[in-house]
Amino acid sequence: GQESCGPNEVWTECTGCEMKCGPDENTPCPLMCRRPSCECSPGRGMRRTNDGKCIPASQCPEH
């Protein structure tokens, strides 16, 4: 079943790669499905912080 997702995360059947805050923000993603999970969706402008939170890219700390 669907696990409970954290703030800003979305349950996704076909997860791609998440994007982290920081210099690797523009790393291209492989177009493959990973296992279903809670995704911090880059398509919605979200980024994963180093401590695992999912926040809007505009709130990323300056690097």
Swiss-Prot record:
Locations listed in the record: Secreted
Entry superkingdom: Eukaryota
Lineage of origin: Eukaryota, Metazoa, Ecdysozoa, Nematoda, Chromadorea
Protein name: Chymotrypsin/elastase isoinhibitor 1
Main location: secreted
Secreted as UniProt keyword: yes
A GO molecular-function annotation: serine-type endopeptidase inhibitor activity
One GO term describing the cellular component: extracellular region
Family of this protein: Belongs to the serine protease inhibitor-like (TIL domain-containing) family.
TIL domain ranges (all copies): 5-60
Function: Defends the organism against the host's proteinases.
Keyword flag Secreted: yes
SS bond partners: 5-38, 14-33, 17-29, 21-60, 40-54
Residues with site note (Reactive bond): 31-32
Keywords of the record: Disulfide bond, Protease inhibitor, Secreted, Serine protease inhibitor
